[in-house]
Regions:
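Active-site proximal loops enriched in glycine and acidic residues that flank catalytic Cys/His/Asp
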Residues: 5-7, 13, 20-21, 28, ...
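Glycine-centered loop/turn positions within well-structured domains
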Residues: 14, 22, 35, 94, ...
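Conserved tyrosine-mediated DNA breakage-rejoining catalytic core shared by Y-recombinases
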Residues: 19-101
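Short, basic (Lys/Arg/His-rich) helix/loop patches that form interaction surfaces
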Residues: 9, 86, 102-177
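Short, intrinsically disordered, charge-balanced linker/junction segments flanking boundaries
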Residues: 2, 175-180
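Basic, Lys/Arg- and aromatic-enriched nucleic-acid-binding interface segment
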Residues: 1-13, 17-19, 29-32, 81-83, ...
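Flexible loop/turn segments at secondary-structure boundaries
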Residues: 12-13, 44-45, 95, 128-129, ...
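Charged catalytic carboxylate motif
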Residues: 1, 91, 95, 133, ...
Length: 180
């Protein structure tokens, strides 16, 4: 799902991990559905957090790594234009619906031990997926699928923008709006 969000909607890793179920409106756009990007999840050094404008931070997640010098931080996106609402494709809408059902099943399976962090991307125990974990999972998947072009996760976003540029007949402004 994360790969599809990056390829189809040109989302950054932090934007993907910053998504919450409430950001999805399955009925919008005459039933086509939309997703609103308005947050980014980043791993930030604790020393840098002290210098960060508190108005930029929505939430600092509890430390899961003992003695860590960094924390997972849910904050405003990279730029003002990064906040945007995008249309879903039918397959992406169906995949998101299935994903939400999987999250419900994960919560039931944990029998009261689930810690719902509120994010769309969560570990089976309900805690948020860190950006470095998503990148590692993607690298592992890539190594298992040599038939696909070797590309880093962020490269999916660039490929998406290139595809959109071709499909739009070179309309740079339209692509800039989609990519934030």
């Amino acid at each position: 799902l994360a790969v599809h969000l990056s390829m189809i909607l040109s989302l950054r890793v932090g934007e993907i991990l910053g998504l919450q179920p409430g950001d999805i409106d399955f009925d919008a756009a005459d039933g086509r559905g939309t997703i609103t990007v308005g947050r980014s999840l980043q791993r930030t050094e604790k020393a840098a957090l002290e210098k960060t404008d508190p108005n930029q931070i929505y939430h600092i997640f509890p430390d899961q790594r003992e003695g860590s010098s960094s924390a997972l931080v849910l904050k405003k996106p990279k730029t003002k234009k990064s906040s945007r609402t995008l249309y879903l494709t039918r397959p992406l809408k169906e995949e998101l619906l299935a994903w939400l059902e999987k999250l419900r099943q994960d919560e039931l399976a944990m029998d009261g031990r689930y810690r719902n962090c509120g994010q769309l991307f969560r570990l089976p125990n309900g805690m948020p997926v860190a950006p470095e974990a998503l990148s590692k999972w993607y690298r592992t998947w890539r190594a298992e699928h040599p038939e696909f072009e070797k590309i880093v996760f962020h490269g999916l976003r660039h490929s998406s923008a290139t595809y959109q540029l071709i499909e739009s007949g070179g309309n740079i402004k339209a692509v800039q709006g989609n990519t934030g």
